[in-house]
Amino acid sequence: MSNVDYIVSTEESDILIENDSKRITDDIVDQLIVYRKQLKLTQQDIADATGIKRANIARLELKKNEASLDSLVRYAKSMKLELAIELVKR
């Protein structure tokens, strides 16, 4: 997806911004899954380490609902990773 102009405040741009947010979250989830599998960890291992129910880890990985920032951070920390969010001037 191309860059979204966040200054334009129309119904259409809100949809584009939401889609961009979903894409970013999905990309992070994909990376977390890759790391989990490289470490040979199960969803249950992640659940035990984070306190998030295994069923919710599965939903997060299946992208059933948009993951909260807190869940992504806890998931990353369970594998000794840090989730970094960076603001970049356009």
Region spans (language model):
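Short, charged recognition helix plus adjacent turn
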Residues: 86-90
